[in-house]
Amino acid sequence: MTHNQRVGKWGEEQAALYLGQRGYNIAARNVRTPYGEIDLIADKDGQTVFVEVKTRLSDSAGPPETGVTGRKQSHMMASAEYYAQEHDLEHWRIDVVAVQRLAGQTDVVHFENAVA
């Protein structure tokens, strides 16, 4: 596993813990679709939440959420629509969780309905 893969897995774990503490049930991780991978799939209050996790260990490239480009959003939407259709889901949304570790402190920011 590469350094970036380890960082990504660590960030996904931090995001899952954060969401779990806020009442989300993590139903699946790293789900592949023909359009890309969905990092986390969670359920809360009868709604399925597709979660893109962005992780950074420095601020040199800006905050993690800036990594969610227009192209990435298109892939996220296509992946979510594919999964929702395959699983007959009516109520769903796409969130982004940004995880950043600076000076020994981990910050997690949750953006609900980040892609519409």
Which residue ranges define each predicted feature?
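Domain-level recognition of nuclease-like catalytic cores that cleave nucleotide substrates
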Residues: E86-A116
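Acidic-basic catalytic patches of nuclease active cores, encompassing PD-(D/E)XK
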Residues: M1-R29
